[in-house]
Each structure stands twice: as structure tokens, then as C-alpha cells.
């Protein structure tokens, strides 16, 4: 769960003018050619969207617009794709976003309408209503839940810890439970949104699914750190890696949150990790390294 840079709306007027037009198909006139005044009415809805930080409002549905104009804007959404008339909207949205801002698990591959286009038709091609998400997050969102999720562009997340994980070792395996901290220093409306999406997107289950495969990559490092410096070495390794990943991603990304929790778990650091992540080769590698250092020091 993280913020993304707010897209520019400098081309908003030109975008509407580009995708709204009439054409003839099988001797039948289709499409919609808005007047200048109608374009300004749509831009006023964009202004209201910005002012209310993307929160749901009846006025954003365009009750003052004609049904034909609302429908034409909604049907213009495919024009944001590669071969459409306004592909820059999609290109800009995905630029420099390598991970879904909601889950932090998978890369974004789809544009989500923060306020659903089936309900808020005038916002169908508005750049600030289009958020890049992964397939799983976008697929789990329901149109009826518009406004219940944190807005990646407008709901500014303060630099506080709100995601936490309980860790335990059971039957030789690592057991994790992710949750949102009710005591986190967040405005109540924002906290409610984050808690809602944690449940609605099944983030705890999705994080847990990736925990074991992620930790396997740290097997050798953990064993070597422990063999050379004991439990303190394990803690140092976990905290150092957590610092690196928190800087790379963000403090509430599920991976650094997990590493910090493991660093604080005495049972895991003082040997429990060997059961969870067995590696018979790590001890040999540590011995070889120690022997090499001894030779070099001689």
C-alpha cells in the first residue's frame, strides 16, 4: 500500500475533444459530438473530483450531462489502449510503476477506475481516476465498493507503520498473520479504507502465499550469519535486509515488515530458522570463509 505520483491533467480537454465525435456506420450516425459548453461541464466534474480527493459524490455522475454524452465518454475508454487515440493516458499511468500500489506483490497490468466507470461515466477517461493495479487486485474490486479503497493519488499515506505481522514457528513451518494496526497514527477515514482493502483484497492470504518462497532466497545468508556470529548475526542480517527493502519499496511493504518481525522473534533468530529453512551447505560455506580469512590474516 503506497502512494503514486498524481498524473498531469494538462491534456484533459484535448483528450475529450479527441475521443468524442460522430461517425457513420452502416449508414447510421453514431458517437457524440459535444459542444464547447459540454466539454467545460465535464472539466468542471474533473475539478470537483480533484477538490473532493476522488471521494464519491452524486455530482461526479454527471446528472447535468446528457445521457448520450455520459455514454460516449464511457465507451471512449478503449481509446486509452495502445492503438487508441489517447494511449498516453495509459503509458503515463504505468510509467515507473513496477509494483501494484495496493498489494506490492505483482506488477501492475491493468488500469483500475477508482470510481467505477459503470457508475461515474464522466470519469471514464480521466487520468486521475485511472490507477495501475495488478490483475488480482483489480479483479477483486467491485463497482459497488467505489470510494471504499485508499486512493493511490489522493489519500496521502503518512510515514507511519500501519502494516504489521505476527510470526510463529509451528510444526517446523513459519506461520504469519498480517493485519492493519488499529492504533496506527492514521486519520480514521484513511485507516478504515486501508482495513477494508486488506480484507476485500485478501491481502493476508496473498502475502502468506509468497512468504515461504521469498524466505527461501535468504536461507544461505541466514545460516552463514548465524554460523559466524550466532543469533546476533541472524538479527543483523534480517534488520539490514529489511532496511534495504524498506528503502527500495516502502516501510509498509509486506517484505520488510516480515523481516523486521523475524528479527524481533528470538525463537527464529536463535536457531528456529534452521528448522524452517534447513540448509546443510551453509555451515560448510561459513567454515570455508572463516578458514580463508584465517589464512589471509596469517
Predicted regions and their residues:
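Generic hydrophobic, aliphatic-rich segments that mediate packing or membrane embedding
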Residues: 65, 69, 85, 96-99, ...
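N-terminal accessory alpha/beta regions
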Residues: 2-83
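Short cysteine-rich loop/turn motifs with clustered Cys
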Residues: 88-110, 134
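Short secondary-structure junctions and interdomain/linker hinges
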Residues: 27, 80, 96, 160-161, ...
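C-terminal, charged low-complexity interaction regions
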Residues: 1-26, 193-298
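Short Cys/His-rich Zn2+-coordinating modules
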Residues: 76-90, 112-119
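Long alpha-helical scaffolds
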Residues: 39-43, 108, 226-230, 234
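Glycine- and acidic-residue-rich phosphate-binding/metal-coordinating active-site segment common to enzymes
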Residues: 107-189
Amino acid at each position: 500500500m503506497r502512494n503514486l505520483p498524481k498524473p498531469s491533467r494538462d491534456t484533459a480537454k484535448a483528450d475529450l475533444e479527441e475521443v468524442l465525435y460522430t461517425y457513420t456506420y452502416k449508414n447510421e450516425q453514431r458517437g457524440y459530438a459535444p459542444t464547447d459548453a459540454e466539454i467545460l461541464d465535464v472539466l468542471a466534474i474533473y475539478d470537483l473530483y480533484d477538490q473532493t480527493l476522488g471521494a464519491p459524490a452524486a455530482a461526479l455522475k454527471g446528472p447535468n450531462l446528457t445521457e448520450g454524452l455520459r455514454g460516449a465518454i464511457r465507451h471512449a475508454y478503449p481509446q486509452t489502449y495502445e492503438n487508441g487515440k489517447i494511449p498516453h493516458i495509459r503509458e503515463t499511468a504505468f510509467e515507473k510503476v513496477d509494483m501494484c500500489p495496493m498489494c506490492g506483490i505483482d506488477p501492475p497490468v491493468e488500469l483500475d477506475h477508482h470510481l467505477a466507470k459503470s457508475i461515474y461515466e464522466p470519469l471514464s477517461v480521466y487520468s486521475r481516476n485511472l490507477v495501475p493495479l495488478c490483475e488480482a487486485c483489480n479483479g477483486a474490486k467491485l463497482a459497488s465498493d467505489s470510494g471504499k479503497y485508499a486512493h493511490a493519488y489522493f489519500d496521502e499515506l503518512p510515514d507511519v507503520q500501519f502494516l504489521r505481522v505476527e510470526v510463529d514457528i509451528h510444526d517446523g513451518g513459519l506461520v504469519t498473520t498480517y493485519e492493519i494496526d488499529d492504533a496506527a497514527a492514521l486519520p480514521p477515514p484513511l485507516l478504515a479504507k486501508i482495513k477494508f482493502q486488506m480484507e476485500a483484497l485478501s491481502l493476508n492470504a496473498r502475502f502468506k502465499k509468497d512468504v515461504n518462497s521469498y524466505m527461501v532466497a535468504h536461507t544461505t545468508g541466514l545460516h552463514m550469519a548465524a554460523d559466524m556470529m550466532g543469533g546476533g548475526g541472524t538479527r543483523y542480517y534480517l534488520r539490514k535486509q529489511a532496511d534495504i527493502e524498506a528503502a527500495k519499496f516502502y516501510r509498509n511493504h509486506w517484505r520488510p515488515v516480515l523481516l523486521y518481525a523475524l528479527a524481533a522473534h528470538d525463537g527464529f533468530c536463535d536457531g528456529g530458522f534452521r528448522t524452517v529453512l534447513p540448509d546443510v551447505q551453509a555451515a560448510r560455506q561459513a567454515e570455508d570463509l572463516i578458514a580463508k580469512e584465517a589464512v589471509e590474516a596469517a
